Amino acid sequence: MSEALTELASYLGEARGNLIAASQMKYGELTLTTTGENLVALLTFLRDDAKCGFVNLIDICGVDWPQRELRFDVVYHLLSPKKNLRIRVKVATDEDTPVPSACPVYPGADWFERETWDMYGVLFTGHPDLRRILTDYGFEGHPLRKDFPTTGFVEVRYDDAAKRVVYEPVELKQEFRNFDFMSPWEGTEYVLPGDEKAKQ
């Protein structure tokens, strides 16, 4: 499998190297990194080329790297049923730079891009219906960003007396506590008889 992916990586470098910023084989998986400007052209080539045949878009997801200038990675997972191969295509972007929508190439990208926008705040240009898909309409923020508070901003519950869903400020039942204990799995500092070599 990884031999076929290595051959594919060299073929893509020759055929469309201008669309690929980086190519990486790691753990038997091929990851192509491209730019937003080249994304649609690369996805179209991967779908239409006879040696590729990546006709299935399995998933699109986001990754948040807050310490980087281009904070987000948008990751496309593709499948070629004829070749029995999977690859990953990555595009890096920031909070203000939109990524071109993959919907013209893979119509199934619609909900994946909506989810990525809803969870991370990554904008997609040319998307037919970019709106929230998992969170509520009035939701503030994007919950999978690393800077989103783990408690959220509001608490949502059904009020049986009012017969409707109500939003309330988050009220923590106890103060934040930091449990900083030694792990019982780290072991002790002393050496038992017979373990002298293991501690060296």
Swiss-Prot record:
Its EC number is 7.1.1.-. It catalyses: a quinone + NADH + 5 H(+)(in) = a quinol + NAD(+) + 4 H(+)(out). NDH-1 shuttles electrons from NADH, via FMN and iron-sulfur (Fe-S) centers, to quinones in the respiratory chain. The immediate electron acceptor for the enzyme in this species is believed to be ubiquinone. Couples the redox reaction to proton translocation (for every two electrons transferred, four hydrogen ions are translocated across the cytoplasmic membrane), and thus conserves the redox energy in a proton gradient. The lineage of its organism: Bacteria, Pseudomonadati, Pseudomonadota, Alphaproteobacteria, Hyphomicrobiales. Keywords: Cell inner membrane, Cell membrane, Membrane, NAD, Quinone, Translocase, Transport, Ubiquinone. This is NADH-quinone oxidoreductase subunit C. It is a peripheral membrane protein. It is found in: Cell inner membrane. NDH-1 is composed of 14 different subunits. Subunits NuoB, C, D, E, F, and G constitute the peripheral sector of the complex. The keyword rRNA processing does not apply. The keyword Transport applies.
